[in-house]
């Protein structure tokens, strides 16, 4: 019998080696006392992305490699087919979140019987200066 999770985090990846370590680190540091899996769908990267993921050696991370580039939407859809979580969280490889994001969104969804929750989106330049609220 396969393991079920409270949350499946789906990360589509294409040539993201310069961002990937930061993305993985923040996911592995989540202050979340429920079970979750990190599904990384590599969309035929030609850089070092797969090696960066493999070096993490975490049982939470599941790497799926696509033979050809199909785009981020297709990679997300493949992640959805693989996901075993009650809830799904999408994160792009060049994004970052706070270490309490999964806990906050999951708690809010469960306590209010919501099917969908989301947080604010802010654009941050490389200098880490807040640029603007997007959503």
Name these PLM-found stretches.
Residues 1-135:
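Nucleotide-sugar donor-binding/catalytic module of glycosyltransferases
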């Amino acid at each position: 019998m396969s393991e079920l999770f409270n949350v499946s985090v789906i990360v589509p990846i294409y040539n993201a080696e310069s961002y990937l370590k930061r993305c993985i680190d923040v996911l592995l540091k989540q202050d979340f006392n429920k079970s979750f899996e990190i599904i990384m769908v590599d969309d035929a990267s030609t850089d070092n992305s797969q090696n960066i993921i493999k070096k993490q050696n975490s049982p939470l991370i599941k790497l799926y490699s696509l033979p050809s580039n199909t785009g981020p939407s297709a990679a997300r859809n493949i992640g959805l087919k693989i996901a075993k979580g009650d809830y799904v969280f999408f994160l792009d490889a060049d994004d970052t979140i706070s270490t309490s994001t999964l806990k906050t969104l999951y708690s809010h969804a469960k306590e209010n019987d919501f099917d969908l929750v989301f947080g604010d989106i802010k654009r941050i330049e490389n200098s880490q200066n807040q640029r603007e609220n997007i959503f």
